[in-house]
Structures are given as C-alpha cells and as structure tokens.
Amino acid sequence: HPVHMISTAPCFYHKENRLKTFVNEDYYDDLKYVEDNYSVIIGNDVWIGSGAYIKSGIRIGDGAVIGAGAVVTKDVEPYAIVAGVPARLIRYRFSKEQIESLLHIKWWDKDDDWLKENGHYFSDANGFISRFRQLEDSSNRRK
C-alpha cells in the first residue's frame, strides 16, 4: 500500500479502479506478481483453521494442521499440529516412521479408483501403511 500518500484508497492512485477514480494516471504500482520467496507453499491434505494468519514465504508440510487463529511465522513440518500466537508445535499427528511412510505413499496422487478401493483404510494409519506395502509388494513381484 502507498503509505507515503495522503490516502491509501486505490481511487487516489489508480486510474482504472473498479469502483471509482479521481486521478488520470497511476501513481503507485501494486505488486502484480509476488516473487517465489514470498509465496506461501501449502502441502497436500493440509487443514487450516478459521482466521489463521500465515506469514509470507512460509512452507506448510503435507498433512499439517494449523489451529484456528494461529499466527504462523515459521515453516510447519509435515503432519505437525501447530496453534497459538505465534504458532508453536502442539504435537505430530503420527510417529516419525508413520510420517515417513505416508510421505512415501503420497496417497493424494492416487486416482479415484485407488481411493475408492482403499478408502476404508484411512481410519487406521498402521492398517493403511500395511495395506500400501502389500500392494507395493504384489506390484513389485509382477515386474
């Protein structure tokens, strides 16, 4: 925002403002494209609670949970649960070994048929991982 101007309202610095404009030329260039180092990267299957704030440049790992109203100022690891102001680690959703397996499985890349066939395993992490290993082993034996 142009904090150096009398008003920060776009009608005073953009000639093509959607609502109304009082100027004939642009006096301030908005950031049209944000550089990658300012982008927030959100992994797969992430849950972000209502009103959470995520600082620019932050990476949220796969399977992470951000509590409602949290202020995230640091990267969040995969399958971490964070909450608070500033956000802090509450706990991990799964054990280190389970997290490694889930990141290897990448279930979010599976097609709908695979998800339908294996959806009932999603309620038990160990059963899910075991099922995937069985499928992987049988697939490797066929090769």
Report the location of each language-model feature:
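Flexible, glycine/small-residue-enriched loop-and-beta-strand segment within the central core
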Residues: 1-58
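Glycine-centered loop/turn positions within well-structured domains
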Residues: 70, 74, 78-80, 88
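Conserved catalytic-core motifs of eukaryotic protein kinase domains, centered on the activation segment
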Residues: 92-93
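Leloir-type glycosyltransferase catalytic cores
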Residues: 106, 113-123
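C-terminal amphipathic helix plus adjacent low-complexity
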Residues: 123-143
